[in-house]
Protein backbone atom coordinates (compact mmCIF):
# COMPACT_ATOMS: atom_id res chain seq x y z
CA UNK A 1 0.00 0.00 0.00
CA UNK A 2 1.60 3.26 -1.09
CA UNK A 3 1.79 5.69 1.83
CA UNK A 4 1.31 9.36 1.00
CA UNK A 5 4.90 10.21 1.97
CA UNK A 6 6.22 7.55 -0.41
CA UNK A 7 3.82 8.67 -3.12
CA UNK A 8 5.03 12.26 -2.73
CA UNK A 9 8.64 11.08 -2.96
CA UNK A 10 7.95 9.24 -6.22
CA UNK A 11 5.96 12.18 -7.52
CA UNK A 12 9.02 14.42 -7.14
CA UNK A 13 11.45 11.83 -8.53
CA UNK A 14 9.32 11.00 -11.58
CA UNK A 15 9.28 14.67 -12.58
CA UNK A 16 13.05 14.39 -13.12
CA UNK A 17 13.03 11.48 -15.57
CA UNK A 18 11.68 10.31 -18.91
CA UNK A 19 11.51 6.75 -17.60
CA UNK A 20 8.55 4.83 -16.21
CA UNK A 21 7.45 3.44 -12.84
CA UNK A 22 6.88 -0.14 -11.64
CA UNK A 23 5.08 -1.17 -8.45
CA UNK A 24 5.23 -4.65 -6.93
CA UNK A 25 2.20 -5.15 -4.70
CA UNK A 26 -0.60 -2.64 -5.30
CA UNK A 27 -3.04 -3.71 -2.54
CA UNK A 28 -6.04 -1.38 -3.16
CA UNK A 29 -4.33 0.35 -6.10
CA UNK A 30 -4.72 3.90 -4.79
CA UNK A 31 -1.05 4.86 -5.11
CA UNK A 32 -0.72 3.53 -8.66
CA UNK A 33 -3.93 5.32 -9.62
CA UNK A 34 -2.69 8.65 -8.22
CA UNK A 35 0.68 8.35 -9.99
CA UNK A 36 -1.06 7.49 -13.26
CA UNK A 37 -3.29 10.56 -12.99
CA UNK A 38 -0.36 12.82 -12.12
CA UNK A 39 1.83 11.44 -14.92
CA UNK A 40 -0.47 10.69 -17.87
CA UNK A 41 2.49 10.58 -20.27
CA UNK A 42 4.29 7.88 -18.27
CA UNK A 43 3.54 4.19 -18.17
CA UNK A 44 2.74 2.95 -14.67
CA UNK A 45 3.43 -0.79 -14.56
CA UNK A 46 2.37 -2.96 -11.67
CA UNK A 47 2.04 -6.55 -10.57
CA UNK A 48 -0.04 -8.17 -7.83
CA UNK A 49 -1.71 -11.60 -7.54
CA UNK A 50 -4.06 -10.35 -4.79
CA UNK A 51 -3.14 -13.25 -2.52
CA UNK A 52 -2.80 -12.60 1.22
CA UNK A 53 0.85 -13.19 2.15
CA UNK A 54 0.15 -13.44 5.87
CA UNK A 55 1.60 -10.02 6.72
CA UNK A 56 -1.54 -7.94 6.17
CA UNK A 57 -4.02 -10.33 7.83
CA UNK A 58 -4.92 -7.81 10.54
CA UNK A 59 -5.83 -5.24 7.88
CA UNK A 60 -7.38 -7.56 5.30
CA UNK A 61 -9.14 -10.03 7.63
CA UNK A 62 -8.27 -12.66 5.04
CA UNK A 63 -6.32 -15.83 5.83
CA UNK A 64 -2.85 -16.36 4.37
CA UNK A 65 -3.04 -17.78 0.86
CA UNK A 66 -6.59 -16.57 0.21
CA UNK A 67 -7.66 -14.12 -2.50
CA UNK A 68 -7.96 -10.44 -1.53
CA UNK A 69 -11.24 -9.88 -3.39
CA UNK A 70 -12.13 -6.38 -2.16
CA UNK A 71 -8.59 -5.12 -2.80
CA UNK A 72 -8.66 -6.68 -6.27
CA UNK A 73 -12.06 -5.19 -7.16
CA UNK A 74 -11.04 -1.73 -5.96
CA UNK A 75 -7.72 -1.81 -7.82
CA UNK A 76 -9.22 -3.04 -11.08
CA UNK A 77 -11.89 -0.33 -10.94
CA UNK A 78 -9.24 2.37 -10.43
CA UNK A 79 -6.95 0.92 -13.10
CA UNK A 80 -9.81 1.04 -15.60
CA UNK A 81 -9.86 4.83 -15.24
CA UNK A 82 -6.27 5.28 -16.47
CA UNK A 83 -5.07 4.03 -19.84
CA UNK A 84 -1.42 4.41 -18.79
CA UNK A 85 -1.64 1.73 -16.07
CA UNK A 86 -0.37 -1.62 -17.29
CA UNK A 87 -1.37 -4.20 -14.70
CA UNK A 88 -0.20 -7.81 -14.51
CA UNK A 89 -2.31 -10.00 -12.23
CA UNK A 90 0.30 -12.56 -11.29
CA UNK A 91 3.00 -13.11 -8.71
CA UNK A 92 6.21 -11.16 -9.12
CA UNK A 93 8.02 -14.52 -9.23
CA UNK A 94 6.01 -15.61 -12.28
CA UNK A 95 6.38 -12.17 -13.82
CA UNK A 96 10.17 -12.31 -13.42
CA UNK A 97 10.34 -15.81 -14.94
CA UNK A 98 8.47 -14.61 -18.03
CA UNK A 99 10.16 -11.21 -18.39
CA UNK A 100 12.01 -10.80 -21.69
CA UNK A 101 14.81 -8.45 -22.69
CA UNK A 102 12.43 -6.85 -25.18
CA UNK A 103 9.92 -6.11 -22.39
CA UNK A 104 12.67 -4.64 -20.21
CA UNK A 105 13.55 -2.25 -23.04
CA UNK A 106 9.91 -1.41 -23.83
CA UNK A 107 8.96 -0.82 -20.19
CA UNK A 108 11.85 1.66 -19.76
CA UNK A 109 11.52 1.59 -15.95
CA UNK A 110 13.81 3.50 -13.61
CA UNK A 111 11.72 3.71 -10.42
CA UNK A 112 10.46 0.64 -8.55
CA UNK A 113 8.40 0.37 -5.37
CA UNK A 114 8.63 -3.00 -3.59
CA UNK A 115 5.64 -3.76 -1.37
CA UNK A 116 4.64 -7.26 -2.44
CA UNK A 117 5.28 -10.62 -0.78
CA UNK A 118 6.89 -9.67 2.53
CA UNK A 119 8.72 -12.97 3.02
CA UNK A 120 12.49 -13.15 2.56
CA UNK A 121 12.11 -15.13 -0.69
CA UNK A 122 9.44 -12.75 -1.96
CA UNK A 123 11.39 -9.57 -1.19
CA UNK A 124 14.56 -11.13 -2.64
CA UNK A 125 12.76 -11.99 -5.87
CA UNK A 126 11.42 -8.45 -5.99
CA UNK A 127 14.81 -6.75 -5.77
CA UNK A 128 16.10 -9.03 -8.55
CA UNK A 129 13.08 -8.01 -10.64
CA UNK A 130 13.69 -4.33 -9.83
CA UNK A 131 17.33 -4.51 -10.89
CA UNK A 132 16.42 -6.31 -14.13
CA UNK A 133 13.85 -3.63 -14.93
CA UNK A 134 16.23 -0.76 -14.20
CA UNK A 135 18.91 -2.58 -16.21
CA UNK A 136 21.87 -0.26 -16.94
CA UNK A 137 20.04 2.99 -16.15
CA UNK A 138 20.14 5.17 -13.07
CA UNK A 139 17.13 4.52 -10.91
CA UNK A 140 15.47 4.30 -7.54
CA UNK A 141 14.27 1.28 -5.59
CA UNK A 142 12.08 1.79 -2.54
CA UNK A 143 11.40 -1.05 -0.11
CA UNK A 144 8.37 -0.80 2.18
CA UNK A 145 7.75 -2.64 5.46
CA UNK A 146 11.44 -2.84 6.27
CA UNK A 147 10.58 -3.68 9.87
CA UNK A 148 9.39 -7.14 8.82
CA UNK A 149 12.16 -9.74 9.30
CA UNK A 150 12.01 -11.21 5.78
CA UNK A 151 12.14 -7.80 4.11
CA UNK A 152 14.94 -6.59 6.38
CA UNK A 153 17.00 -9.70 5.69
CA UNK A 154 16.44 -9.38 1.93
CA UNK A 155 17.60 -5.75 2.05
CA UNK A 156 20.86 -6.78 3.72
CA UNK A 157 21.50 -9.35 0.98
CA UNK A 158 20.53 -6.77 -1.68
CA UNK A 159 23.17 -4.37 -0.32
CA UNK A 160 25.84 -7.09 -0.38
CA UNK A 161 24.82 -8.22 -3.89
CA UNK A 162 24.80 -4.81 -5.60
CA UNK A 163 27.32 -2.61 -3.74
CA UNK A 164 28.72 -1.13 -6.96
CA UNK A 165 25.26 -0.08 -8.19
CA UNK A 166 23.93 1.44 -4.95
CA UNK A 167 24.96 5.10 -4.88
CA UNK A 168 22.97 6.10 -1.79
CA UNK A 169 20.65 4.75 0.87
CA UNK A 170 18.32 6.81 3.01
CA UNK A 171 15.45 6.28 5.42
CA UNK A 172 13.83 9.71 5.73
CA UNK A 173 10.77 9.18 3.52
CA UNK A 174 8.83 7.07 6.06
CA UNK A 175 9.95 5.11 9.16
CA UNK A 176 9.25 1.73 7.54
CA UNK A 177 10.78 2.60 4.16
CA UNK A 178 14.30 2.53 2.76
CA UNK A 179 15.27 4.22 -0.50
CA UNK A 180 18.19 3.14 -2.67
CA UNK A 181 19.46 5.25 -5.52
CA UNK A 182 20.93 3.05 -8.23
CA UNK A 183 23.78 4.20 -10.45
CA UNK A 184 24.01 3.39 -14.12
CA UNK A 185 26.50 0.85 -15.42
Feature roles, as predicted:
Residues 7-185:
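S-adenosylmethionine/decaboxylated-SAM
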Residues 1-6:
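Conserved SAM-binding loop and adjacent beta-strand
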Amino acid sequence: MLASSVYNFFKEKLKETDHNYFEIGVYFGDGVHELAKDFPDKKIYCVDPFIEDGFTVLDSNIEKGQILNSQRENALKLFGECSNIIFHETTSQQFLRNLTKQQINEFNVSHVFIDGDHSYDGASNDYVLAMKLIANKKGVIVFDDTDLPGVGQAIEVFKRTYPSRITSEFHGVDPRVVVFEIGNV
